[in-house]
Every structure is written in structure tokens, then in C-alpha cells.
Amino acid sequence: MKKKVLALAAAITVVAPLQSVAFAHENDGGSKIKIVHRWSAEDKHKEGVNSHLWIVNRAIDIMSRNTTLVKQDRVAQLNEWRTELENGIYAADYENPYYDNSTFASHFYDPDNGKTYIPFAKQAKETGAKYFKLAGESYKNKDMKQAFFYLGLSLHYLGDVNQPMHAANFTNLSYPQGFHSKYENFVDTIKDNYKVTDGNGYWNWKGTNPEEWIHGAAVVAKQDYSGIVNDNTKDWFVKAAVSQEYADKWRAEVTPMTGKRLMDAQRVTAGYIQLWFDTYGDR
């Protein structure tokens, strides 16, 4: 989501200098750095610029391949209500209350302290679980449009904590400023290299409540944080402002761990969707 602008007074003082910086590793004709934090979600229905949607679609593909553990009418329902699901995935980044008045605080969750980056704000674990449960209530009431919209919201928050920066409260204003957004732009260019091609989701991975799953995903993601954000990648990112060589270096450095994260996210998401159906029953 390339428009996640922090509405904090402290952030406002940083926006002006950031806007004047262009990086050697830009692929869009020198567009400026923006204050953003997300897996990308630029278009409701286009995977190329919406890694949240890409992860969910790959998770549904995993479910479709597993005809032993996954009831295929569940896959059929996901496809039947795909528009509502995608609307929920997208709305999390573009509509209130989901994007928290442009602070996006609820899209972050550090599993070590249970908090987001803004004190006392709601975080991704409680927010994702909230919409998981609201989706289930709507499903039981046979309000399918609302059910799958809420499910899309919940999947967005789960997707966020699968990204190590979100699980470590590393925002786009963290040093080096702009690294968060440039990293996620880069992820969009390599994600198709890391499609899961089997039917092995993380079935029954955690307990029976969504909080455990979101927390567990954040724990694993944070363990991988140093493979993406470390002294080398930060130094190279800063130097990439004037050097394509260093842009290539930080990208190469983060690629292996990014691939691991993308594959884990697909499998966790498949299991999480299965948990939702297991919890609230089939239509």
C-alpha cells in the first residue's frame, strides 16, 4: 500500500526531506520515497502490485491441490465470493477504521512485547482475530458478502505479520528511512519465483483460535528479521541513493530470506483459512 502516510506530528517533520530523495534503484522514473509500511496492496484485483492478494491466491491454490484434508467446496466458496474477499484485503490499507486514520498501527505486531509501534494502539494480532471472528459470525448468519469481506480483512493482518519488518515494528520512518517501502516494492518483482506448488499448507499449525496463529506467524517472521534488516543491508540501502551497485547488493542479500518468508506466508495462510472453515462450519 504505497499511501500509508503516518498522521503523527513527528512524522510530518520528516516528510519534506524524504520527498527530495531519489534512489539509484528506482524502477519508476525517479519517483519519490513515501511514508509506507506494507506488503503491497496497490490494486484490488491485480496480483502484480498486491502481494497480499498474491499470498491469499497462492494459499487457495494450495488448498485446491489437497483433496485429502481440504473439502473442495471450501475452495469453491472462496472462488464464489472472491470479489468480497479481495475487497476486504484491499480495504485494510485504504479505508477507516482499518488503516487507523493513516497511522496503520494495527498492521504491526511485535510478538516479544505484544505491541505495535504506537503506544496503547491496537495491533495486528487482536485486529486480525477480531475480523476472523466477525467473518465467522456473518458466515453463520448466511451473510456471505460480509463474511468474506471480513475474512479478507483478517487475512490482510495475518499477511502483515508474516513480513519481518511488521513483526519488529520497523516502519518506513525507521532508519534508514524508506527502506521498508523499497523492500516491499522489490518483493513484488521476485515473488513469482517463490510460489508453493504442492498442497502442503500448515494444517493444524497452532491452536484453535486466530490469535495463536497470528502470534505464531509473527514469532517466525521476527526470527527472520536479521536476514533482511541488518547492518549490511542498511548501509547498502543508504549507498544505493547514488549507486546501482549497492542497490543490487542489498537486493541480493535480502532475497533468500524473502523467499523463505513468502513460502511460509502461503502455507500459513492456507492453514488459517482452513481453521476458519473448521471453526464456523460449512454452508
Swiss-Prot record:
Keywords, comma-separated and alphabetical: Cytolysis, Hemolysis, Hydrolase, Metal-binding, Signal, Zinc, Zymogen
Catalysed transformations (reactions): a 1,2-diacyl-sn-glycero-3-phosphocholine + H2O = phosphocholine + a 1,2-diacyl-sn-glycerol + H(+)
Note accompanying the cofactor annotation: Binds 3 Zn(2+) ions per subunit.
Annotated binding of Zn(2+) 3, by residue: W39, H52, D160
Cell inner membrane found in the keyword field: no
Residues reported to bind Zn(2+) 1: D93, H107, H156, D160
Entry protein name: Phospholipase C
Organism, scientific name: Bacillus cereus
